[in-house]
Amino acid sequence: FMQKVLIYMNKLIDFYFDFISPYSYLAHKKILNINERKNFNYKAILLGGLHNLGNITAPAFNERKMKNMREDCNLIAKKNDVSFKWNEKFPINSLYLMRGYLFIDANKKDKFFDTCFDAYWKENVDISKEENIKEILSNCKIDQKSFITGIKNEKIKNELKNLTNLAFEKNIFGAPTFIVNNKLFWGQDRLEYALDEFKS
């Protein structure tokens, strides 16, 4: 029995995300609402890079899918009482912020994560613009000079590339994706299934 408890305590749900994914934002808000953040290991990937690897056309580049996605996200947000506003600057290049998430200190990651997501999917901010990135850094008390140097560091560049490649190798094709016990759950509507597996 004791061994099972220890295994349960050490196990986390891997959550693959990109700040440009509205469904990742909605999934994260659900996680906060049910106070489960401690059980998730957030893994940054570059969604555009993942789509290129898998030769996938994102919904953002298909007019009908895009229209459906906007309506779908609004429905999910309303149903779950989540503050959400479709960003007029969708999609953007999230490369610098995704690298930034990997670069910053562990104790600043949660604040940075929440601030980026809220800026883009709640406050309609274009988080690819330099002045808006600077404001995010200021709100998170992150040094701008070290951040700008950090995101150009080869180690950080390669880390994001490797995480994205690894996600592709694990058959991940979109965000959010949850992996627990080597089982893959794709989409914010599969969050409950991932949690069930985690607690089984």
Predicted regions and their residues:
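Short, charged low-complexity linear motifs
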Residues: K4, L97-Y101, A167
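Structural alpha/beta surface segment adjacent to cysteine/selenocysteine redox centers
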Residues: Y23-E123
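A broad, structure-centric signal for solvent-exposed, well-ordered loop/edge residues
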Residues: F1, I20, G49-N52, N93, ...
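Short, Lys/Arg-enriched N-terminal segments with co-localized hydrophobic residues
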Residues: F1-Y8
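C-terminal cap of thioredoxin/glutaredoxin-like
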Residues: N10-D14, D18-N41, K111, T115-S200
